[in-house]
């Protein structure tokens, strides 16, 4: 069974998990978290994030040693999955060799599983390749893993590697490309189609980002590009008769996908053709456990349906330009606030996509969660940026395929400070939002205005809206 729920390590929570030794999760706590996601919450997959994070490479060994009774009943690699996100050497040169180490670690994890289960079971048999933009990047990882496995046949002095060190298993792995940029999302189906022609796998998984596209191009553009990709992937699946299972990376705020325990129905209706939905840290730890379990069960009880059909509207480009103009205006405030947003995971040095993006003049900004948290904390939710570039008629066109757009905008408008937006230089946005006559959470906005001035309680605001960023 292909997973419906992928637990991830995205640090968007304001609450500290009950099992954590520190507010900043890492190492041993993340081993516990993986078990908690499987055993208590009912997730059927855990992403293990080697891309820019300090994670434990002995995760399989530790899970099997610490929780043997659970993993004898629930087989790791069959009933539940552990899926690493690896660095992409094309983009992340400093972390490039970690890709090779992670691929070698897959075979080591299989050795631990063989000892534990008494048979060949691959606890890890797929990897997620972030920032994928071409067929070549996917093929390189595929070929590199093959070389790792073929090392077994090499002669070392007076013996072979296989005789000395043992077999390398599994023989093949699946590569899950993660498409994050506008260009990559728009050509994702084409890239996957080329890959399927060469490989003809039993099935293929595809990961579509929601947070970074929203940060780079705005909420409405991100939803548009992801939905366009989902439609083309569905058509490719019908054309090739090879099952293609999309994963969508969704976080708590509408800006990052709206995946909260109290909003799963909307997410399911918004992305009906998606097979696997991410549940990030806020989903897992900022809500009562009963609500979280119920929400996970709800998703797992449903099946994929046909996606919405759409053509990317021409006016989206104008919206993007205005969104990026407003981000530039807010950049000093975002950077100032980001230093006050608490860290929730141990991270290595990492440059987000915005750092590489030429269309914003190389503007250096924090990653999506702190970006979102910073803007919510001053009462300017990022969902609303660029909205003044669209007419009511254009929003109606978008609502034909982005079915929850008005609900998402209404959610964000509750936390909007007209005063802060005006002071920051977003007069046109202020005038446009007034037309919606939003119901404002006055207590929230009052605190956000204090935060904008340099004081105030950022965690209190996160609790009021239901997520950190």
Curated annotation (Swiss-Prot):
The enzyme's E.C. designation: 4.1.1.31
**Catalytic activity from the UniProt record:** oxaloacetate + phosphate = phosphoenolpyruvate + hydrogencarbonate
- Extract the InterPro entries matched here: PEP_COase_arc-type, Pyrv/PenolPyrv_kinase-like_dom
Task: List the Gene Ontology MF annotations in alphabetical order.
Answer: magnesium ion binding; phosphoenolpyruvate carboxylase activity
Q: Which UniProt keywords apply?
A: Carbon dioxide fixation, Lyase, Magnesium
Q: Which cofactor does it need?
A: Mg(2+)
The UniProt function text for this chain reads: Catalyzes the irreversible beta-carboxylation of phosphoenolpyruvate (PEP) to form oxaloacetate (OAA), a four-carbon dicarboxylic acid source for the tricarboxylic acid cycle.
Q: Which family does it belong to?
A: Belongs to the PEPCase type 2 family.
Listed name of the protein? Phosphoenolpyruvate carboxylase
Question: What is the native source organism of this protein?
Answer: Pyrococcus abyssi (strain GE5 / Orsay)
Its gene name is ppcA
């Amino acid at each position: 069974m292909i997973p419906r729920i992928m637990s991830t390590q995205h640090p968007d929570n304001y609450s500290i998990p009950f099992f954590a030794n520190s507010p900043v999760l890492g190492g041993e706590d993340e081993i516990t978290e993986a078990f908690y996601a499987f055993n208590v919450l009912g997730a059927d997959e855990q992403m293990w994030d080697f891309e820019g994070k300090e994670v434990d490479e002995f995760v399989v060994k530790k899970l099997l040693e610490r929780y043997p009774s659970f993993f004898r009943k629930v087989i790791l690699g069959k009933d539940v999955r552990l899926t690493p996100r690896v660095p992409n050497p094309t983009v992340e040169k400093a972390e490039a060799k970690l890709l090779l180490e992670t691929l070698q670690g897959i075979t080591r994890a299989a050795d631990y599983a063989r000892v534990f289960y008494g048979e060949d079971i691959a606890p890890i048999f797929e990897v997620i390749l972030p920032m994928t933009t071409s067929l070549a990047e996917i093929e390189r990882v595929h070929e590199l893993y093959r070389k790792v496995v073929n090392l077994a046949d090499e002669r070392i002095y007076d013996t072979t590697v296989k005789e000395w060190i043992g077999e390398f298993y599994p023989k093949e792995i699946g590569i899950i490309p993660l498409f994050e940029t506008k260009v990559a999302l728009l050509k994702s189906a084409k890239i996957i189609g080329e890959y399927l022609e060469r490989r003809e796998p039993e099935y293929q998984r595809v990961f579509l980002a929601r947070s970074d596209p929203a940060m780079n191009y705005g909420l409405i553009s991100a939803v548009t590009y992801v939905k366009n990709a989902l439609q083309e992937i569905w058509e490719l699946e019908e054309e090739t008769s090879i099952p293609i299972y999309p994963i969508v990376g969704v976080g708590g705020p509408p800006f990052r996908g709206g995946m909260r325990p109290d909003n799963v129905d909307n997410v399911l209706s918004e992305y009906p053709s998606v097979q696997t939905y991410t549940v990030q840290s806020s989903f897992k730890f900022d809500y009562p456990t009963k609500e979280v379990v119920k929400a996970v069960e709800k998703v797992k009880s449903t099946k994929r349906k046909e996606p919405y059909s759409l053509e990317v509207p021409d006016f989206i480009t104008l919206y993007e330009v205005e969104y990026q103009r407003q981000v530039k205006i807010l950049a000093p405030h975002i950077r100032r606030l980001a230093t006050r947003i608490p860290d929730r995971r141990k991270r290595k040095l990492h440059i987000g996509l915005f750092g590489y993006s030429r269309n914003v003049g190389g503007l250096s900004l924090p990653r999506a969660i702190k970006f979102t948290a910073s803007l919510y904390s001053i009462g300017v939710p990022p969902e609303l940026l660029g909205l003044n570039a669209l007419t009511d008629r254009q929003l109606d066109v978008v609502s034909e395929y982005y079915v929850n757009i008005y609900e998402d905008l209404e959610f964000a408008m509750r936390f909007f400070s007209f005063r802060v937006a005006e002071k920051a230089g977003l007069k046109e946005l202020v005038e446009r939002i007034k037309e919606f006559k939003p119901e404002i959470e006055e207590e929230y906005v009052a605190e956000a205005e204090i935060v904008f001035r340099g004081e105030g309680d950022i965690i209190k605001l996160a609790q009021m809206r239901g997520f950190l960023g």
